[in-house]
């Protein structure tokens, strides 16, 4: 006789975390938005590929807006109402991602630019020939 099927999936525990940190990593090819609590534990994340954008469409401001909305909705399900925003990188989706957080209904308390800037670090690669 066959054993009855047991459900091995974890149930998501609904947390009530009022404040969070939105990490926006924007490169020239992609944008990744991660929303964590104040300790750094990830609550929700999203990227252009996870939503369904492919190729050069991943680097557009529209894609960044959709990514930010998806990550914010996941965090709001866990009770996040206000976020501090940390933006890293020079990509085209920086501003659109921050704007989308306010459109969804999250309160943005501060915006911090964490883009790493070298103090004349390593030697750059040779220039591509034309």
UniProtKB/Swiss-Prot annotation:
HAMAP family tied to this protein: Ribosomal_uS11
Oligomeric form and interacting partners: Part of the 30S ribosomal subunit. Interacts with proteins S7 and S18. Binds to IF-3.
Gene name per UniProt: rpsK
Any GO BP: translation
Family the UniProt entry places it in: Belongs to the universal ribosomal protein uS11 family.
PROSITE patterns: RIBOSOMAL_S11
Key words, A-Z: Ribonucleoprotein, Ribosomal protein, RNA-binding, rRNA-binding
GO cellular component, as recorded: ribonucleoprotein complex; ribosome
Organism: Mesoplasma florum (strain ATCC 33453 / NBRC 100688 / NCTC 11704 / L1)
Superkingdom of origin: Bacteria
Protein name according to UniProt: Small ribosomal subunit protein uS11
Pfam families per the UniProt record, alphabetical: Ribosomal_S11 (PF00411)
Summary of the function given for this chain in its UniProt record: Located on the platform of the 30S subunit, it bridges several disparate RNA helices of the 16S rRNA. Forms part of the Shine-Dalgarno cleft in the 70S ribosome.
GO molecular function, one term: rRNA binding
């Amino acid at each position: 006789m066959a054993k009855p099927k047991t459900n091995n999936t974890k149930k998501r525990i609904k947390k009530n975390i009022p404040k969070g940190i939105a990490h926006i990593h924007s490169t020239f090819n992609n944008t990744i938005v991660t929303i964590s609590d104040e300790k750094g534990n990830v609550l929700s994340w999203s990227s252009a590929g996870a939503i369904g954008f492919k190729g050069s469409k991943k680097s557009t401001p529209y894609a960044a807006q959709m990514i930010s909305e998806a990550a914010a909705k996941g965090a709001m399900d866990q009770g996040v109402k206000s976020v501090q925003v940390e933006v890293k990188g020079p990509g085209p989706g920086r501003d659109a991602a921050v704007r989308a957080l306010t459109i969804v209904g999250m309160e943005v308390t501060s915006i911090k630019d964490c883009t790493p800037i070298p103090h004349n670090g390593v030697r750059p690669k040779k220039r591509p020939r034309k």
